[in-house]
């Protein structure tokens, strides 16, 4: 997820304030081609007429949880992000508060927290627009539709799939200091390729959201591959954070 500028943070804060007061309904209407009709929403994996093809609907509006997906079993499980330390520290799990000035992040303070809970089996997880994998790696293709992909993932065997990276200022967990440009983040592994499925441009108001519209390939620990097409971040009624993902597994 792309973020820029001190003035950018001010604009984000104003948008958040507007969101809390009025829900920002309609503010970003028309950005995505295929918003989901609210009355048709069925959270989870919605099977299609094609075998191994699903329309995945997720409510990812919260900033205080990770939503874990098991593509093998078509299972979904949410876990809250720990905000305190209740046991022995694992040596790296922290909340870090940064002052954000453009691309410069100045660490103000950090606090130790419990290790992020995870299911026994999972393949990828989402935190709002941020995405991590369970030891997997991701390739952004040049395709904008799963239907247009080559017949087999073997066609991409020579391409470079990128693994997750440890980040300290990617996953926002607390906006309360936004007006002072002070943001709390959860230190966490993140797949920066897949997390780039939606970019935010705050160079000129109002903020503009742009989806890459690309198809991503997720190579999992067992070597199997899933094709993921991030189609929308809102419902037809303008509810932000309702994600629509076209899934093909196995690919």
Which residue stretches match the model-derived regions?
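C-terminal motif of bacterial Sec signal peptides marking the signal peptidase cleavage site
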Residues: 20-23
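Surface-exposed, beta-sheet-biased, low-hydrophobicity segments with strongly acidic/polar composition
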Residues: 25-251
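Hydrophobic helical h-region of N-terminal Sec-dependent signal peptides
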Residues: 14-18
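Bacterial N-terminal signal peptides that target proteins for export
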Residues: 2-12
